[in-house]
Amino acid sequence: MRFHVAGTQTAGVKKSAALVGFAGEIISVRAHLDTAPTGAAFVIDVNKNGTTLFTTQANRPTIAIAGTESTSTLPDVVSVAAGDRLSIDVDVIGSSVAGSDLYVTVSIKRATVQ
């Protein structure tokens, strides 16, 4: 699933959201900014039906100061069902330059039908 939040970033909840189309397991979460943050790292959160997937908050996708890519991150909660709503929160922005044009990819492996 792909999410996009256009423009200069501000902290806030439900910046972008989408419905999951099938049952499965999240295998990675990645984030990208077209303009790098400066002064502070950029941190996002991904929620399923309003609750964070990253119960260990230190594991949230983070883009380093002056960077544009997060590393691939595996959330603590990986199971999703058809109809679940995934949403993106922007928790921390750069303190000098916020960062702009956020892209987030949540990769989901479809559950095997038995």
Show where each model-derived region lies:
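Terminal beta-strand-rich extracellular "head" domains
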Residues: T35-A82
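Beta-sheet-rich sandwich/jelly-roll-like modules and their strand-loop junctions
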Residues: M1-V43, S95-Q114
